Every structure is written in C-alpha cells, then in structure tokens.
Design a protein with these regions (language model features):
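Short, surface-exposed connector motifs at secondary-structure boundaries
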Residues: 178-180, 322-323
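Short, acidic/glycine-rich phosphate-metal binding loop used to engage nucleotide
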Residues: 170
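A conserved hydrophobic secondary-structure block that centers on an alpha-helix together
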Residues: 175, 182-185
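Short, basic, glycine/proline-bearing loop/turn elements
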Residues: 179-181, 354-355
C-alpha cells in the first residue's frame, strides 16, 4: 500500500510486533494507511519472544487473552490450556499474522535507536541500529508496559564465572540447567512460574526474596472440546464482558455483595467456593475487596492461611506469606501459582530472606554472598522485574517538538493524556502508555488502537497535518489519575517496591503510573473523546 503522504516513507511507523503491533497493522490497514511495524527481535510476539524462561505463561485465561477484531479468528484458533505457555501464545500471534497477511508490514531484526520529530518538516524520523532512517507522519509505540528489564546494582556482577542474566533475556539457544545449582534473585511472578519447572531437574534452586507476595492459585487445566464449544458459542458475550469489566477481563462482576456486610460463616463459604484459580477469586467473591480496607484484610488473611497450608515448614511458610500489616492485597500484583509453594517442600529448594535476615552483599566468582552466608551456584538468574510503562519509551531518545526527550520529560512525573499521547510530542501515540489502566492487555491494546485509528481517520479526512496534545488536558488527566490512585489501596505500593508504581527502579522514585478508575470507565473516556472530536488535541494544517 502506498503512503497517502508523499513526503514520508510510511503514514505510520509502529515499534513492537506483539499484540499492539498486530492490532495496529489491522486497524490502520483497514483505514487505508500505509504502516510498517519494526521489532528488534527475530520473530513476532513481543514479551513472549523475550521471556523464554521455563514456565513462562499467561496469567490471563487464554480465551480472552487474544485480539477480537475478527470473529473468524476467534472461531478458528483453538487454545489447549486455561493458561497458555509462551510458545502457544507466540504461535497464536503467528497464526493471526498468517491469516491476516500481516508479514509484509513487519520488519524484524531491526532495532530503533532514535526517533525525532522534525518540526520544519512536520513529521517523524526514526533511525535504526544500522544507521538507516525512515520517515512517517504518525509515530506509534507498541513496545509494551513490561519490556525493559530492571538490572539491580549488585557489587561483583561482572565477576561471576557462570551464566548470569535477567529472566527476560533467558538464552534463546536454550540452557541446560539439569543437575545445576541455580540462584534466583527476586521472588515475583516470574520466579513463581520458574521455580516449579526448574526444581524438577536442577540440583538445587535458591530464591533470594525481598518482599513476599500474596499468591493465588492458577489451577491450570486442559481445554476440553465441551469447554471450547461453550467459549466459541458465547464469544460475543465474552468480548462484551472484557469491554465492561473494571480490569478488562471476562469475569462475572460486580456480584452485588460486600465482604464487610456478610456474616463470617457465609463469607468463609463464599471465599472457599470461589477458590478455583485465577484472579476471579478477587472479583467474583465480593465487590469491596480492593476498595474497603477491612474487606481487604479479610481477603488477605484468607489467602495467607491458604498459602501456609501448602508449605510443610512453618518457618518457610511465614517467610513466603506477606502480612496485611505490611501491605494490603493488590498493593503489589499477586502472582498465580503453578506449584511454587509446594516446591519449598522439596529439600533442594531454599528460600533466603534478604530484607530482614541476610541482605545481599555481593556476587562472587562462584556465587553470591550475604551478610550471613556464602552460596555457590552454576547459574544466577535476575528475576528483578521491569521498568513498567515508561521503561521502553525511555530506553532510546524519543525527542519531541521542544527538543526534550521522553526520559527528560518524565524525570519526576510520568504524564500523559489517557496513556495514549504526550504533550510536546506531536503526531505520536503510545499504546498502553503511562496512566493507562492495569488491565487485560489485549483488551486495552485494541481500545487504544481503535482510538488512534479514529484520530488518524479524522485528520486525513479533514486534511490536517498535525495534532498537538494539549498541556492542560495532560495536566487534568495526570491529576485525575493521581487523585483516584490516592483513594485506592494500591497507593501502598511504594512501601513494598511495587513495579506498578515504578518503586522497583533505582533511577527514579515511586510515581503514579496506572489509572485505577476502572478499565471500562477508561474505555468509555476514549470513546467519548473520539465522539467529541478529540478535544484533548489541537489540530493544524500547514
């Protein structure tokens, strides 16, 4: 497809060939735009290309962790499990690209190292790692909210003689860890997924934990023909549920009852009956678990008791389980458990408390030293999380009309308009950027891309050359996001270094990164913005 804008190579350039890149290709191509999506990886898949660690799987249930623009694709693709692994999820994306003939619009093995808005020309120029340049009218980030890893500053990291890497950079050629001694720094969702798999063949697995997590059961199960038929017969309703749910998921909530108003025995019965896996337990039991501190305490104590039941050693159980007094449920994102807690019942799986008992001192040639002990390892994995929401956008210079980079603009406050555009960055969109909701990502991605496409269609229809995000609109959205955040229990996240507030980063302080007013409310705001002609933006013709 030729570009409608003769002065540029493409109407739109997107960065990132995961769900966002695929959605971008579909919707912009339908709108008649010439689009090219670049990715530094050798295959499509986004986070599922990079996170190759053993046990990597989705935490959203498969049948709504997908794009919904085609009813045919929803019917033709068959998931095999409740929570698909990395390979199956990536295969799904390849299926979408194949069926929709998206490959001609994707350029792999191409890292973008610079993006700059050229004010005189009124368009963007992107530069690749080989020095090649491309121009576009619209520059769009689909790089994802958890794609840039946090690498902790630990003394001696360059001294270790064995493999040492971040979990999201697990060797693509594979790694033989059978019979090896493995040390894992970090105890979040990645570690919860890795440990049960590694423990099957490793000589030993030692986890160095700073903050314990509220851990919910995954309760993985195979997709049966009967279950698949039920899903495919009801996909319209499933898509509608995701669009209207507070976290973009196909859950039956709200349920019309509150924990604080329910008698103790009845409350316990409801908690027990719904202990069937996934985040459903949080949303399909009571409506006040994330809003009312007392209800949250009840839920937290139930989870803590359930966790301790599965660990034979009470001392280890106490280390693994958080305390409500330290932080409430969902101040940190709870991982889903595929056998993590039970792994500590094995003699060769060890937990080390590095917050209160034996802090890390340094990495040595042969392992790791704490204030109390020395540990020898063959492999060290940094499961230390990501620079959420802003990290990928700050990883290389993205320079707007003021000459300022995004990294410079966001040094103290990460501001945006609905997570999709940023003042002083004309004709640039960010898919699920900072101050977008924390929700089922494919749902949020599609809602963002629909808004972006409608904006571009308006500009092309009306002959507009530029949109400029209004500074007052950015300030208003940032203030609204901060006000809502302050009223939630998630505001406690800075106390436990939650990545949802960027508190896990050493280069920046905690900040409000997520809109917690509800995904459905946010999607409504996007629709209202488009229906009203995008009042958050100023349009220009040159």
């Amino acid at each position: 497809m030729s570009t409608a804008n003769a002065k540029v190579d493409f109407d739109a350039i997107g960065i990132g060939a995961g769900f966002a890149g695929l959605a971008l290709i579909h919707y912009l191509r339908e709108a008649g735009r010439a689009v090219r999506v670049f990715d530094r990886a050798s295959d499509i898949g986004g986070t599922w290309t990079w996170n190759r660690y053993p046990g990597a799987a989705t935490d959203s249930e498969s049948y709504y962790y997908c794009l919904t623009f085609s009813k045919e694709l929803l019917q033709e693709w068959s998931w095999t499990k409740r929570y698909p692994g990395r390979e199956e999820t990536q295969n799904y994306m390849r299926f979408v690209a194949d069926k929709c003939d998206m490959w001609p619009h994707i350029q792999l093995n191409t890292e973008i190292v610079d993006a700059q808005f050229l004010d005189d020309e009124g368009h963007w120029r992107v530069t690749t790692g080989t020095g090649e340049t491309f121009t576009c009218k619209y520059f769009i980030s689909g790089m994802g909210m958890i794609s840039e890893p946090v690498i902790p500053k630990i003394k001696g990291m360059d001294r270790f003689k064995g493999p040492l890497f971040h979990s999201s950079r697990w060797p693509q050629e594979g790694l033989d860890y059978a019979g090896k001694r493995i040390g894992i720094i970090g105890a979040g969702a990645t570690t919860v997924q890795m440990v049960p798999v590694l423990a099957k063949t490793a000589a030993s697995v030692t986890v160095f934990q700073r903050t314990p997590n509220y851990i919910l059961p995954a309760m993985q199960k195979e997709m049966t023909p009967e279950w698949e038929k039920e899903i495919k017969d009801n996909y319209d309703a499933i898509v509608a549920k995701c669009r209207n749910h507070v976290f973009g998921m196909a859950f039956d909530s709200p349920v019309g009852r509150n924990a604080v108003d329910t008698p103790p025995e009845e409350r316990q019965r409801i908690f027990e009956e719904n202990w069937t896996g996934s985040f459903r337990w949080v949303f399909e039991t009571f409506d006040d678990l994330l809003a009312n501190p007392e209800a949250n305490r009840m839920a937290s104590e139930f989870i803590i008791a359930k966790m301790k039941e599965r660990v034979n050693d009470p001392e280890i159980g106490n280390l693994l389980a958080p305390r409500f007094e330290d932080y409430p449920l969902f101040a940190k994102r709870p991982p889903l458990d595929h056998g993590y807690l039970e792994a500590y019942n094995e003699d060769h799986v060890t937990l080390v408390d590095i917050k209160d008992r034996e802090p890390l001192v340094e990495i040595t040639e042969t392992g790791l030293r704490t204030t109390l002990n020395e540990y020898e390892f063959d492999i060290i994995v940094l499961a230390t999380g990501f620079k959420a929401y802003t990290g990928a956008l700050e990883a290389f210079p993205i320079r707007g009309s003021s000459g300022q980079t995004l990294r410079e603009k966001w040094q103290t406050v990460s501001e945006s308009i609905m997570g999709v555009c940023v003042a002083d960055f004309p004709n640039m969109f960010t898919i699920t950027g900072p101050q977008a909701p924390f929700a089922n990502l494919p749902t949020s991605i599609e809602q963002n891309v629909i808004w972006i496409t409608r904006c571009i269609e308006k500009m092309e229809r009306e002959g507009k050359d530029l949109f400029k995000p209004r500074r007052d609109a950015e300030q208003a959205w940032t203030a609204q996001t901060a006000d809502i955040h302050a009223q939630t229990l998630m505001a406690n996240g800075d106390k436990v270094n939650s990545w949802m507030m960027g508190a896990n980063r050493e280069d920046k302080g905690a900040r409000v990164l997520i809109y917690f007013g509800g995904a459905s409310v946010y999607y409504d705001a996007l629709d209202q913005s488009a229906a009203n002609g995008f009042p958050e933006l100023e349009f220009e013709t040159r």
